[in-house]
């Protein structure tokens, strides 16, 4: 079950998340 946890963390650690375009745009600004 550690793989699942790593996957979740990686998804949240992604610099540019497709689910959060606003966040990505704000970071790019």
From Swiss-Prot:
Residues 1-29 are annotated as: Disordered. It is found in: Cytoplasm. Keywords: 2Fe-2S, 3Fe-4S, 4Fe-4S, Cytoplasm, Iron, Iron-sulfur, Metal-binding, NAD, Oxidoreductase, Plasmid. Disulfide bonds: none annotated. Its EC number is 1.12.1.2. One of its GO terms (cellular component) is cytoplasm. It catalyses: H2 + NAD(+) = NADH + H(+). Binds 2 [4Fe-4S] clusters. Binds 1 [3Fe-4S] cluster. Its cofactor is [4Fe-4S] cluster; [3Fe-4S] cluster; [2Fe-2S] cluster; FMN. It is an enzyme of class 1 (oxidoreductase). Residues 1-11 have a biased composition (Basic and acidic residues). Its main location: cytoplasm. Tetramer of an alpha and a gamma subunits (flavin-containing dimer), and a delta and a nickel-containing beta subunits (hydrogenase dimer). Belongs to the [NiFe]/[NiFeSe] hydrogenase small subunit family. This is NAD-reducing hydrogenase HoxS subunit delta. It comes from Rhodococcus opacus.
């Amino acid at each position: 079950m550690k793989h699942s946890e790593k996957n979740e963390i990686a998804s949240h650690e992604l610099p540019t998340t497709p689910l959060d375009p606003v966040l990505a745009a704000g970071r790019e600004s």
